[in-house]
Amino acid sequence: MASSSSFTYYCPPSSSPVWSEPLYSLRPEHVRERLQDDSVETVTSIEQAKVEEKIQEVFSSYKFNHLVPRLILQREKHFHYLKRGLRQLTDAYECLDASRPWLCYWILHSLELLDEPIPQIVATDVCQFLELCQSPDGGFGGGPGQYPHLAPTYAAVNALCIIGTEEAYNVINREKLLQYLYSLKQPDGSFLMHVGGEVDVRSAYCAASVASLTNIITPDLFEGTAEWIARCQNWEGGIGGVPGMEAHGGYTFCGLAALVILKKERSLNLKSLLQWVTSRQMRFEGGFQGRCNKLVDGCYSFWQAGLLPLLHRALHAQGDPALSMSHWMFHQQALQEYILMCCQCPAGGLLDKPGKSRDFYHTCYCLSGLSIAQHFGSGAMLHDMVMGVPENVLQPTHPVYNIGPEKVIQATTHFLQKPVPGFEECEDEVTSDPATD
Protein backbone atom coordinates (compact mmCIF):
# COMPACT_ATOMS: atom_id res chain seq x y z
CA MET A 1 0.00 0.00 0.00
CA ALA A 2 1.05 3.55 -0.60
CA SER A 3 0.95 4.73 3.00
CA SER A 4 -0.20 3.65 6.44
CA SER A 5 -3.43 5.57 5.93
CA SER A 6 -4.29 3.82 2.66
CA PHE A 7 -4.65 0.09 3.23
CA THR A 8 -5.26 -1.86 0.02
CA TYR A 9 -5.56 -5.50 -0.95
CA TYR A 10 -3.21 -5.44 -3.92
CA CYS A 11 -0.19 -7.67 -3.42
CA PRO A 12 2.17 -7.48 -6.42
CA PRO A 13 4.37 -10.50 -7.10
CA SER A 14 7.58 -10.30 -5.13
CA SER A 15 10.52 -12.39 -4.03
CA SER A 16 8.75 -13.99 -1.11
CA PRO A 17 10.77 -15.01 1.96
CA VAL A 18 10.47 -18.63 3.01
CA TRP A 19 9.44 -19.14 6.63
CA SER A 20 12.15 -21.16 8.32
CA GLU A 21 10.58 -21.75 11.75
CA PRO A 22 9.90 -25.38 12.80
CA LEU A 23 6.55 -26.66 11.64
CA TYR A 24 3.89 -25.58 14.11
CA SER A 25 1.82 -28.75 13.72
CA LEU A 26 4.77 -31.11 14.37
CA ARG A 27 5.75 -29.76 17.77
CA PRO A 28 5.60 -32.50 20.46
CA GLU A 29 3.25 -30.39 22.57
CA HIS A 30 0.82 -29.85 19.69
CA VAL A 31 -1.11 -32.99 20.63
CA ARG A 32 -2.45 -31.05 23.61
CA GLU A 33 -4.57 -29.02 21.19
CA ARG A 34 -6.79 -32.04 20.46
CA LEU A 35 -10.40 -32.09 21.63
CA GLN A 36 -11.01 -32.66 25.33
CA ASP A 37 -14.58 -33.92 25.72
CA ASP A 38 -14.39 -34.38 29.52
CA SER A 39 -15.68 -37.94 29.03
CA VAL A 40 -19.00 -36.64 27.73
CA GLU A 41 -19.34 -38.02 24.21
CA THR A 42 -21.72 -36.58 21.63
CA VAL A 43 -22.16 -37.26 17.93
CA THR A 44 -20.24 -34.03 17.31
CA SER A 45 -17.33 -34.91 19.59
CA ILE A 46 -17.06 -38.44 18.17
CA GLU A 47 -16.83 -37.12 14.60
CA GLN A 48 -14.32 -34.47 15.65
CA ALA A 49 -12.15 -37.09 17.35
CA LYS A 50 -12.19 -39.24 14.19
CA VAL A 51 -11.00 -36.32 12.07
CA GLU A 52 -8.29 -35.41 14.56
CA GLU A 53 -7.07 -39.02 14.57
CA LYS A 54 -6.74 -39.02 10.78
CA ILE A 55 -4.90 -35.72 10.85
CA GLN A 56 -2.62 -36.92 13.63
CA GLU A 57 -1.73 -39.87 11.39
CA VAL A 58 -0.84 -37.44 8.60
CA PHE A 59 1.30 -35.32 10.92
CA SER A 60 3.06 -38.39 12.37
CA SER A 61 3.66 -39.92 8.94
CA TYR A 62 5.04 -36.65 7.64
CA LYS A 63 7.40 -36.33 10.58
CA PHE A 64 8.54 -39.98 10.27
CA ASN A 65 9.17 -39.80 6.52
CA HIS A 66 11.05 -36.49 6.50
CA LEU A 67 14.30 -36.14 8.42
CA VAL A 68 13.99 -32.40 7.87
CA PRO A 69 10.25 -31.77 7.28
CA ARG A 70 9.75 -29.55 4.23
CA LEU A 71 6.36 -28.59 2.90
CA ILE A 72 6.02 -28.86 -0.88
CA LEU A 73 3.13 -27.69 -3.04
CA GLN A 74 2.78 -30.30 -5.79
CA ARG A 75 2.44 -27.69 -8.51
CA GLU A 76 3.01 -29.93 -11.54
CA LYS A 77 0.49 -32.53 -10.39
CA HIS A 78 -2.12 -29.88 -9.66
CA PHE A 79 -1.48 -28.24 -13.04
CA HIS A 80 -2.00 -31.47 -14.98
CA TYR A 81 -5.16 -32.27 -13.00
CA LEU A 82 -6.58 -28.83 -13.79
CA LYS A 83 -5.47 -28.89 -17.42
CA ARG A 84 -7.26 -32.20 -18.02
CA GLY A 85 -10.42 -30.94 -16.34
CA LEU A 86 -10.67 -27.89 -18.56
CA ARG A 87 -10.93 -30.11 -21.64
CA GLN A 88 -12.72 -33.24 -20.51
CA LEU A 89 -14.52 -34.45 -17.38
CA THR A 90 -15.44 -37.96 -16.30
CA ASP A 91 -19.05 -39.04 -15.85
CA ALA A 92 -18.57 -38.46 -12.11
CA TYR A 93 -19.17 -34.77 -12.85
CA GLU A 94 -22.60 -35.39 -14.38
CA CYS A 95 -24.17 -34.11 -11.15
CA LEU A 96 -22.58 -30.70 -11.85
CA ASP A 97 -24.21 -30.27 -15.25
CA ALA A 98 -25.91 -27.13 -13.89
CA SER A 99 -22.59 -25.77 -12.59
CA ARG A 100 -20.47 -25.71 -15.71
CA PRO A 101 -19.50 -22.01 -15.49
CA TRP A 102 -18.35 -22.79 -11.95
CA LEU A 103 -16.06 -25.51 -13.27
CA CYS A 104 -14.57 -22.99 -15.71
CA TYR A 105 -14.01 -20.49 -12.92
CA TRP A 106 -12.61 -22.95 -10.38
CA ILE A 107 -10.11 -24.30 -12.89
CA LEU A 108 -9.09 -20.95 -14.41
CA HIS A 109 -8.62 -19.32 -11.01
CA SER A 110 -6.58 -22.26 -9.76
CA LEU A 111 -4.36 -21.96 -12.83
CA GLU A 112 -3.86 -18.22 -12.33
CA LEU A 113 -2.90 -18.80 -8.69
CA LEU A 114 -0.31 -21.32 -9.89
CA ASP A 115 0.87 -18.69 -12.41
CA GLU A 116 0.09 -21.01 -15.32
CA PRO A 117 -0.82 -19.12 -18.52
CA ILE A 118 -4.04 -19.97 -20.32
CA PRO A 119 -3.39 -20.79 -24.02
CA GLN A 120 -5.25 -18.50 -26.40
CA ILE A 121 -7.11 -21.37 -28.03
CA VAL A 122 -8.36 -22.55 -24.63
CA ALA A 123 -9.38 -19.02 -23.65
CA THR A 124 -11.37 -18.67 -26.88
CA ASP A 125 -13.07 -22.02 -26.30
CA VAL A 126 -14.07 -20.96 -22.78
CA CYS A 127 -15.43 -17.64 -24.06
CA GLN A 128 -17.49 -19.38 -26.73
CA PHE A 129 -18.83 -21.91 -24.24
CA LEU A 130 -19.81 -19.25 -21.70
CA GLU A 131 -21.52 -17.28 -24.44
CA LEU A 132 -23.72 -20.34 -24.99
CA CYS A 133 -24.56 -20.29 -21.27
CA GLN A 134 -25.71 -16.65 -21.41
CA SER A 135 -29.48 -16.25 -21.39
CA PRO A 136 -31.26 -13.99 -23.90
CA ASP A 137 -32.93 -12.49 -20.81
CA GLY A 138 -29.60 -11.65 -19.19
CA GLY A 139 -27.33 -13.49 -16.79
CA PHE A 140 -25.81 -16.93 -17.22
CA GLY A 141 -27.24 -20.37 -16.66
CA GLY A 142 -25.48 -23.46 -15.39
CA GLY A 143 -25.06 -24.71 -18.95
CA PRO A 144 -26.20 -23.96 -22.52
CA GLY A 145 -29.96 -23.45 -22.68
CA GLN A 146 -30.44 -23.46 -18.91
CA TYR A 147 -32.31 -20.81 -16.94
CA PRO A 148 -30.15 -17.91 -15.71
CA HIS A 149 -29.08 -18.00 -12.08
CA LEU A 150 -26.97 -15.59 -10.04
CA ALA A 151 -24.45 -18.22 -8.92
CA PRO A 152 -23.29 -19.29 -12.41
CA THR A 153 -23.57 -15.64 -13.48
CA TYR A 154 -20.98 -14.76 -10.83
CA ALA A 155 -18.79 -17.68 -11.89
CA ALA A 156 -19.04 -16.83 -15.60
CA VAL A 157 -18.17 -13.15 -15.09
CA ASN A 158 -15.21 -14.07 -12.88
CA ALA A 159 -13.97 -16.60 -15.45
CA LEU A 160 -14.22 -14.04 -18.24
CA CYS A 161 -12.39 -11.44 -16.15
CA ILE A 162 -9.61 -13.95 -15.47
CA ILE A 163 -9.19 -14.44 -19.22
CA GLY A 164 -9.21 -10.65 -19.45
CA THR A 165 -9.28 -10.20 -23.23
CA GLU A 166 -11.52 -8.01 -25.37
CA GLU A 167 -13.13 -11.20 -26.62
CA ALA A 168 -13.92 -12.25 -23.05
CA TYR A 169 -15.31 -8.87 -22.00
CA ASN A 170 -17.49 -8.71 -25.11
CA VAL A 171 -19.26 -11.92 -24.13
CA ILE A 172 -21.05 -10.11 -21.30
CA ASN A 173 -24.30 -8.45 -22.37
CA ARG A 174 -24.26 -5.66 -19.80
CA GLU A 175 -27.65 -4.22 -20.74
CA LYS A 176 -29.41 -7.56 -20.33
CA LEU A 177 -27.41 -8.34 -17.20
CA LEU A 178 -28.65 -5.15 -15.55
CA GLN A 179 -32.23 -5.96 -16.51
CA TYR A 180 -31.78 -9.42 -15.05
CA LEU A 181 -30.51 -8.04 -11.74
CA TYR A 182 -33.51 -5.72 -11.52
CA SER A 183 -35.82 -8.70 -12.12
CA LEU A 184 -34.34 -10.37 -9.02
CA LYS A 185 -34.32 -7.33 -6.72
CA GLN A 186 -36.79 -7.52 -3.82
CA PRO A 187 -38.49 -4.61 -2.00
CA ASP A 188 -36.50 -5.26 1.20
CA GLY A 189 -33.15 -4.90 -0.62
CA SER A 190 -32.42 -8.62 -1.01
CA PHE A 191 -32.09 -10.53 -4.29
CA LEU A 192 -33.52 -13.81 -5.54
CA MET A 193 -30.97 -16.36 -6.73
CA HIS A 194 -33.13 -16.84 -9.83
CA VAL A 195 -36.62 -15.90 -10.96
CA GLY A 196 -38.98 -17.70 -8.61
CA GLY A 197 -36.06 -18.88 -6.47
CA GLU A 198 -34.79 -18.45 -2.94
CA VAL A 199 -33.38 -15.35 -1.24
CA ASP A 200 -30.14 -15.42 0.73
CA VAL A 201 -26.92 -13.48 1.22
CA ARG A 202 -25.17 -15.27 -1.66
CA SER A 203 -27.43 -13.54 -4.16
CA ALA A 204 -26.65 -10.08 -2.80
CA TYR A 205 -22.93 -10.77 -3.11
CA CYS A 206 -23.15 -12.30 -6.59
CA ALA A 207 -25.20 -9.33 -7.77
CA ALA A 208 -22.85 -6.76 -6.23
CA SER A 209 -19.78 -8.55 -7.58
CA VAL A 210 -20.87 -8.78 -11.21
CA ALA A 211 -22.41 -5.31 -11.18
CA SER A 212 -19.26 -3.66 -9.81
CA LEU A 213 -16.88 -5.53 -12.12
CA THR A 214 -18.92 -4.66 -15.23
CA ASN A 215 -19.90 -1.10 -14.22
CA ILE A 216 -23.67 -1.52 -14.25
CA ILE A 217 -24.44 -0.22 -10.76
CA THR A 218 -27.26 2.33 -10.84
CA PRO A 219 -28.29 4.66 -8.01
CA ASP A 220 -31.19 2.44 -6.91
CA LEU A 221 -30.02 -1.08 -7.80
CA PHE A 222 -28.72 -1.80 -4.31
CA GLU A 223 -31.08 0.43 -2.36
CA GLY A 224 -31.75 -1.28 0.97
CA THR A 225 -29.29 -4.12 0.31
CA ALA A 226 -26.72 -3.12 2.94
CA GLU A 227 -29.43 -2.80 5.57
CA TRP A 228 -30.82 -6.23 4.67
CA ILE A 229 -27.36 -7.84 4.91
CA ALA A 230 -26.79 -6.20 8.30
CA ARG A 231 -29.98 -7.85 9.58
CA CYS A 232 -28.41 -11.22 8.69
CA GLN A 233 -25.67 -10.76 11.30
CA ASN A 234 -26.73 -12.75 14.35
CA TRP A 235 -25.81 -12.95 18.02
CA GLU A 236 -22.76 -15.12 17.25
CA GLY A 237 -21.17 -12.29 15.25
CA GLY A 238 -21.19 -14.08 11.90
CA ILE A 239 -23.77 -13.82 9.13
CA GLY A 240 -26.51 -16.29 8.28
CA GLY A 241 -28.19 -16.91 4.95
CA VAL A 242 -31.18 -14.77 5.92
CA PRO A 243 -32.06 -12.80 9.07
CA GLY A 244 -32.35 -15.04 12.13
CA MET A 245 -30.32 -17.98 10.80
CA GLU A 246 -27.12 -19.59 12.12
CA ALA A 247 -23.85 -17.90 11.18
CA HIS A 248 -21.99 -19.68 8.37
CA GLY A 249 -18.60 -19.07 6.76
CA GLY A 250 -19.82 -18.92 3.18
CA TYR A 251 -22.70 -16.57 3.95
CA THR A 252 -20.47 -14.43 6.18
CA PHE A 253 -17.94 -13.98 3.40
CA CYS A 254 -20.68 -13.11 0.91
CA GLY A 255 -22.24 -10.60 3.29
CA LEU A 256 -19.06 -8.76 4.21
CA ALA A 257 -17.66 -8.79 0.66
CA ALA A 258 -20.93 -7.35 -0.68
CA LEU A 259 -20.79 -4.58 1.93
CA VAL A 260 -17.17 -3.82 0.99
CA ILE A 261 -18.26 -3.37 -2.63
CA LEU A 262 -21.12 -1.12 -1.51
CA LYS A 263 -18.84 0.75 0.93
CA LYS A 264 -21.13 -0.13 3.85
CA GLU A 265 -18.86 -2.33 6.01
CA ARG A 266 -19.75 -0.24 9.06
CA SER A 267 -23.29 -1.57 8.84
CA LEU A 268 -21.95 -4.60 10.72
CA ASN A 269 -20.59 -5.07 14.22
CA LEU A 270 -17.05 -5.66 12.97
CA LYS A 271 -15.52 -6.57 16.33
CA SER A 272 -18.17 -9.22 16.91
CA LEU A 273 -17.60 -10.58 13.41
CA LEU A 274 -13.84 -10.65 14.01
CA GLN A 275 -14.29 -12.66 17.20
CA TRP A 276 -16.56 -15.13 15.42
CA VAL A 277 -14.31 -15.78 12.42
CA THR A 278 -11.06 -16.07 14.38
CA SER A 279 -12.78 -18.67 16.57
CA ARG A 280 -13.43 -20.79 13.49
CA GLN A 281 -9.75 -21.69 13.00
CA MET A 282 -9.25 -25.15 14.48
CA ARG A 283 -6.63 -25.36 17.21
CA PHE A 284 -5.33 -28.81 16.27
CA GLU A 285 -5.92 -29.05 12.52
CA GLY A 286 -4.94 -25.48 11.63
CA GLY A 287 -7.68 -25.17 9.01
CA PHE A 288 -11.08 -23.55 9.39
CA GLN A 289 -14.56 -24.88 10.11
CA GLY A 290 -17.63 -23.33 8.50
CA ARG A 291 -19.79 -23.13 11.60
CA CYS A 292 -19.49 -23.62 15.34
CA ASN A 293 -19.11 -27.32 16.29
CA LYS A 294 -18.53 -28.42 12.69
CA LEU A 295 -15.55 -30.20 11.16
CA VAL A 296 -12.56 -28.62 9.43
CA ASP A 297 -12.93 -28.25 5.66
CA GLY A 298 -10.28 -27.08 3.21
CA CYS A 299 -12.69 -24.83 1.31
CA TYR A 300 -13.05 -22.59 4.37
CA SER A 301 -9.37 -21.78 3.96
CA PHE A 302 -10.76 -19.09 1.68
CA TRP A 303 -14.33 -18.48 2.85
CA GLN A 304 -13.15 -17.82 6.42
CA ALA A 305 -9.52 -16.71 6.03
CA GLY A 306 -10.59 -14.43 3.17
CA LEU A 307 -12.67 -12.47 5.66
CA LEU A 308 -9.59 -11.38 7.59
CA PRO A 309 -8.14 -9.05 4.90
CA LEU A 310 -11.59 -7.47 4.52
CA LEU A 311 -11.90 -6.97 8.28
CA HIS A 312 -8.31 -5.72 8.52
CA ARG A 313 -9.00 -3.03 5.95
CA ALA A 314 -12.31 -2.02 7.52
CA LEU A 315 -10.82 -1.77 11.03
CA HIS A 316 -7.76 0.05 9.66
CA ALA A 317 -10.07 2.63 8.09
CA GLN A 318 -11.58 3.18 11.53
CA GLY A 319 -8.11 3.88 12.95
CA ASP A 320 -7.83 0.77 15.14
CA PRO A 321 -4.37 1.14 16.77
CA ALA A 322 -4.09 -2.55 17.74
CA LEU A 323 -3.87 -3.84 14.17
CA SER A 324 -0.70 -5.58 13.01
CA MET A 325 0.93 -4.12 9.94
CA SER A 326 2.64 -7.39 9.04
CA HIS A 327 0.17 -10.22 9.68
CA TRP A 328 -3.50 -11.05 9.24
CA MET A 329 -5.49 -11.86 12.37
CA PHE A 330 -5.30 -15.63 12.04
CA HIS A 331 -2.54 -18.24 12.31
CA GLN A 332 -1.16 -18.07 8.78
CA GLN A 333 1.49 -20.72 9.38
CA ALA A 334 -0.98 -23.27 10.77
CA LEU A 335 -3.36 -22.81 7.83
CA GLN A 336 -0.56 -23.29 5.29
CA GLU A 337 0.55 -26.44 7.09
CA TYR A 338 -2.99 -27.86 7.06
CA ILE A 339 -3.40 -27.23 3.33
CA LEU A 340 0.04 -28.52 2.33
CA MET A 341 0.09 -31.59 4.58
CA CYS A 342 -3.58 -32.60 4.75
CA CYS A 343 -5.34 -31.32 1.61
CA GLN A 344 -3.12 -32.35 -1.31
CA CYS A 345 -4.08 -35.43 -3.32
CA PRO A 346 -0.95 -37.37 -4.35
CA ALA A 347 -2.29 -37.54 -7.93
CA GLY A 348 -2.99 -33.79 -8.10
CA GLY A 349 -5.83 -31.61 -6.93
CA LEU A 350 -6.80 -30.61 -3.40
CA LEU A 351 -9.49 -31.80 -1.04
CA ASP A 352 -11.64 -31.12 2.02
CA LYS A 353 -9.71 -33.19 4.58
CA PRO A 354 -7.81 -36.51 4.74
CA GLY A 355 -10.02 -39.34 3.53
CA LYS A 356 -12.03 -37.18 1.13
CA SER A 357 -11.79 -37.10 -2.66
CA ARG A 358 -10.21 -34.29 -4.66
CA ASP A 359 -12.37 -31.97 -6.74
CA PHE A 360 -12.07 -28.67 -8.58
CA TYR A 361 -14.08 -26.76 -5.96
CA HIS A 362 -11.71 -27.64 -3.13
CA THR A 363 -8.68 -27.20 -5.38
CA CYS A 364 -9.77 -23.63 -6.09
CA TYR A 365 -10.58 -22.62 -2.53
CA CYS A 366 -7.68 -24.43 -0.85
CA LEU A 367 -5.27 -22.65 -3.20
CA SER A 368 -7.11 -19.35 -2.68
CA GLY A 369 -6.78 -19.71 1.09
CA LEU A 370 -3.13 -20.67 0.76
CA SER A 371 -2.55 -17.47 -1.22
CA ILE A 372 -4.30 -15.37 1.43
CA ALA A 373 -2.14 -17.00 4.12
CA GLN A 374 1.06 -16.26 2.17
CA HIS A 375 0.53 -12.59 1.34
CA PHE A 376 -0.13 -9.59 3.58
CA GLY A 377 -0.64 -6.01 2.40
CA SER A 378 1.21 -4.45 -0.52
CA GLY A 379 3.81 -1.88 -1.47
CA ALA A 380 5.84 -0.66 1.50
CA MET A 381 3.65 -2.75 3.81
CA LEU A 382 4.06 -6.01 1.86
CA HIS A 383 4.89 -8.90 4.16
CA ASP A 384 4.95 -12.44 2.80
CA MET A 385 5.05 -15.66 4.78
CA VAL A 386 5.62 -18.71 2.56
CA MET A 387 5.88 -22.03 4.35
CA GLY A 388 8.09 -24.71 2.80
CA VAL A 389 10.16 -24.38 -0.36
CA PRO A 390 10.31 -21.08 -2.30
CA GLU A 391 8.38 -22.64 -5.19
CA ASN A 392 5.30 -22.88 -2.95
CA VAL A 393 4.52 -19.19 -3.44
CA LEU A 394 1.24 -18.52 -5.23
CA GLN A 395 0.00 -15.46 -7.04
CA PRO A 396 -2.11 -13.15 -4.85
CA THR A 397 -5.89 -13.17 -4.99
CA HIS A 398 -8.29 -10.30 -4.43
CA PRO A 399 -10.25 -11.16 -1.26
CA VAL A 400 -13.44 -9.45 -2.46
CA TYR A 401 -13.74 -11.12 -5.88
CA ASN A 402 -11.30 -14.04 -5.56
CA ILE A 403 -9.57 -13.43 -8.85
CA GLY A 404 -6.16 -11.86 -9.41
CA PRO A 405 -5.96 -8.24 -8.18
CA GLU A 406 -4.57 -7.11 -11.52
CA LYS A 407 -7.52 -8.79 -13.28
CA VAL A 408 -9.93 -6.81 -11.09
CA ILE A 409 -8.17 -3.56 -12.00
CA GLN A 410 -8.05 -4.50 -15.68
CA ALA A 411 -11.75 -5.40 -15.84
CA THR A 412 -13.00 -2.39 -13.90
CA THR A 413 -10.79 -0.07 -15.96
CA HIS A 414 -12.20 -1.57 -19.17
CA PHE A 415 -15.85 -1.35 -18.16
CA LEU A 416 -15.57 2.09 -16.55
CA GLN A 417 -14.91 3.40 -20.06
CA LYS A 418 -18.44 2.36 -20.96
CA PRO A 419 -21.56 4.13 -19.67
CA VAL A 420 -23.89 2.40 -17.25
CA PRO A 421 -26.67 0.95 -19.45
CA GLY A 422 -29.57 3.39 -19.57
CA PHE A 423 -27.49 6.26 -18.14
CA GLU A 424 -25.67 8.62 -20.48
CA GLU A 425 -23.43 9.79 -17.65
CA CYS A 426 -23.38 7.89 -14.38
CA GLU A 427 -20.43 8.22 -12.03
CA ASP A 428 -21.91 6.52 -8.98
CA GLU A 429 -19.25 6.24 -6.27
CA VAL A 430 -19.70 2.51 -5.66
CA THR A 431 -18.47 1.64 -9.16
CA SER A 432 -14.87 2.21 -8.08
CA ASP A 433 -12.63 -0.75 -7.32
CA PRO A 434 -12.45 -1.68 -3.63
CA ALA A 435 -8.87 -2.79 -4.29
CA THR A 436 -7.60 0.71 -4.87
CA ASP A 437 -9.63 2.84 -2.46
From Swiss-Prot:
A single GO BP: regulation of fibroblast proliferation
Site (Important for selectivity against geranylgeranyl diphosphate) residue list: 102
Keyword field: Lipid metabolism, Metal-binding, Phosphoprotein, Prenyltransferase, Repeat, Transferase, Zinc
Residues bearing the modification Phosphothreonine: 436
Chain positions of PFTB repeats: 123-164, 174-215, 222-263, 270-312, 332-374
Pfam families reported in the protein's UniProt record: Prenyltrans
Family under the similarity heading: Belongs to the protein prenyltransferase subunit beta family.
Protein name (record): Protein farnesyltransferase subunit beta
Gene symbol of the encoding locus: Fntb
